[in-house]
Amino acid sequence: MTNILDILACPLCSGKLSCDGGSLKCALGHTFDISKSGYVNLLPPGKGKNSHTGDERDMVKARADFLSRGYYNRLDTRTAEIISDMPQDEMTLVDMGAGEGWHTLKTTSELISRSKKMLSVGFDASKYASECGMKKSRVAGLSEKNPYDMTSRASLVFIPANIFSLPIVNDCADVCLSMFAPIPWDEAYRVLKKSHDSMLLVLSSGKNHLIELRSLIYDSVNISDSLPEVPDGNDSFVSAGTTELCYTAHLENSEDIKNLFTMTPFYYKTTEEGKKRLYSQNELDVTVDVNYTIFKLK
């Protein structure tokens, strides 16, 4: 099984990283400390300062609290179903924008239960999110105290990094996963193994996703079903089709409603009046509408 050090690369020089006590080092001496929770911050100065910043503590906590309630578990089951159809018995999964790690963890656990041997790496610009993910991974038995030791058999690691400049080697991933995040097309192509079996799986919001919540916070709701498309000029990927998952989730209390709202992009664009209408709800049925689009290498 692939070890995490087999695929990691120095974010400053792209050299191979090795474990030296409580740090990772490359041949040029660039050093990255391993935190107590087990993550290594591979987000280099300057490269993390872009328009796609990482989640802060309040959003990370809201996501962790909401997702632990199980409302979105069906998303991860469907994700695992799609990936499990791939022929590889052993695979490396790269989650590009993993957040606090819930979806990566649930998907990885599901794939292992389907007899896949997994190495999953969740990248996110937020060190808070990666810390949360590493703690969950350890509790679930998918990681170890030092997952970067060459004897480690960790199945799931979370690392703060810029998803548009991933600190991993070329041609190392069987699956790249992008869930409700900006899609780094060039990086996905670079890190995917150049095989017809490799896959970029993109999850995006369907036209009715959270329509009930949006109707409460906005005076008028824009309903659109915008599927991800390969950018003009990109000749690396071709769409292999889209499937939809749509169901109703019953949010049982006001805390769950607020946590869901806090973890959405609507949180920063809603008026105080809109928030007041939403926060007055003690329970709420919401539509979960998600598109799964598979992209294959040309």
Q: For the regions a protein language model found, what residue spans apply to each?
A:
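N-terminal auxiliary segments of SAM/dcSAM-dependent transferases
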Residues: 1-52
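Class I SAM-dependent methyltransferase SAM/SAH-binding core
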Residues: 92-95, 100-165
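A short glycine-rich, Lys/Arg-flanked "PGG" loop and its adjoining helix->strand segment in the class I
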Residues: 185-199
